[in-house]
């Protein structure tokens, strides 16, 4: 846990952006010098809760609570229209993500922005985590503030991002009002994991994703789950970039990198969503398919640093589709071994599940 503590401190103490006057804004750099990643702020808040929960280090929390609040308050300031959702700086409108810019989230080559489902789910967990930390310190007013932020976000999330036509969540709703739904398993599943989707709708959503996998003939569960089961529109991808589609239907690069490629680590959320709704059998079906591949060491192929050489992403037939080769994220799905146990799932996700 000292490494976790050091990592949190590195980001919240040394990677906060300053405005023209030199004042800290609360926004954190994501990687290199890239800013405007909403999840860059949510992640350290969640990690701080993990650290304190695991260690009971209240002295550290007392020293860092002000920094954590500044990080969270930046997120609250990004609810620019007051609906409860955290709006990204990026519009998410088609054809607006151009080099050298990046999107608002881990999926940095996908043109997600404005009201983004992935980052808002993480912000929801982050607010709940910080509220719990404030409660541990007896800071009632602050706990109420972050609880209210989480409540507002939850109230707006499903009505804003649910697609009644498909029964799935859209990945993001762009500034022009368009809901961008590409049948994205991780996006739907993460929201289910965190209780942002009503139970009946959650079960139906998972059913629909299985149906969609059958429709598109995806069978390689040993690899994990594709990013999306419907090809991305060319304007929904960073241009120009590795994996960027050129054909109007997006099929020319479908299955490559972030246009429907497979990043094994994110399969955690799809597996865990089944455990969350009581469908252990289908969650285990994916986990048990992936474990032998992990045992053989096939979710990494060493440092590559070359497009189409890294096994950190694969195509639907298991060919390399990434560029890093070794990516620690890839092994995140192993957490599902713990998440299948109700008591451990509640322990890890207590702020969002209680």
What is each of the regions a protein language model found here?
Residues 1-13, 28, 66-73, 114-136, ...:
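Active-site core of glycosidic bond-cleaving carbohydrate-active enzymes
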Residues 74-81, 95-106, 118, 122, ...:
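Calcium-binding acidic motifs and repeat modules
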Residues 18-35, 96-115, 176, 248-249, ...:
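Acidic/His metal-coordination segments adjacent to aromatic residues that form catalytic metal sites
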Residues 51-54, 58-60, 70-72:
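Hydrophobic or amphipathic alpha-helical targeting/insertion segments
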Residues 84-86:
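Acidic, glycine-anchored loop motifs typical of Ca2+
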Residues 32-35, 39, 43, 47-54:
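Hydrophobic/aromatic-rich effector regions of fungal transcription factors
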Residues 347-354:
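Surface beta-strand/loop "capping" patches
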Residues 48, 67-82:
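Active-site cavity-forming subdomains of large catalytic enzyme subunits
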């Amino acid at each position: 846990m000292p490494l976790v503590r050091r990592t949190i401190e590195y980001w919240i103490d040394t990677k906060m952006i300053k405005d023209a006057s030199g004042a800290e804004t609360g926004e954190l750099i994501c990687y290199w010098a890239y800013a405007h990643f909403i999840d860059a702020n949510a992640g350290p808040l969640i990690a701080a809760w993990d650290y304190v929960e695991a260690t009971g280090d209240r002295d550290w929390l007392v020293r860092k609570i002000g920094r954590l609040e500044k990080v969270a308050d930046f997120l609250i300031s990004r609810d620019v229209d007051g609906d409860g959702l955290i709006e990204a700086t990026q519009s998410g409108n088609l054809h607006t993500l151009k080099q050298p810019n990046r999107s608002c989230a881990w999926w940095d080559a996908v043109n997600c922005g404005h009201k983004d489902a992935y980052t808002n789910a993480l912000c929801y967990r982050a607010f709940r985590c910080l509220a719990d930390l404030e409660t541990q310190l007896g800071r009632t007013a602050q706990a109420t503030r972050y609880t209210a932020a989480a409540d507002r976000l939850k109230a707006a999330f499903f009505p804003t991002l649910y697609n009644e036509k498909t029964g799935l969540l859209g990945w993001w709703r762009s500034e022009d009002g368009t809901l961008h739904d590409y049948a994205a398993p991780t996006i739907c599943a993460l929201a289910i994991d965190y209780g942002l989707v009503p139970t009946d709708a959650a079960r139906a959503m998972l059913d629909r994703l299985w149906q969609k996998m059958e429709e598109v003939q995806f069978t390689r569960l040993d690899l994990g789950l594709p990013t999306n089961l419907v090809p991305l529109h060319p304007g929904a991808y960073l241009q120009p970039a590795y994996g960027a589609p050129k054909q109007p239907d997006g099929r020319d690069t479908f299955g490559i990198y972030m246009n429907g490629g497979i990043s094994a680590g994110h399969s955690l959320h799809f597996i865990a969503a089944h455990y969350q709704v009581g469908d252990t059998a289908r969650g285990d079906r994916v986990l048990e398919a992936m474990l032998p591949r992990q045992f053989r060491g096939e979710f990494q192929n060493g440092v590559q640093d070359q497009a189409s050489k890294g096994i950190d992403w694969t195509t639907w037939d298991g060919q390399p589709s990434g560029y890093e080769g070794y990516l620690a994220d890839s092994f995140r799905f192993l957490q599902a071994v713990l998440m299948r146990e109700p008591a451990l799932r509640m322990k890890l996700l207590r702020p969002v599940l209680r």
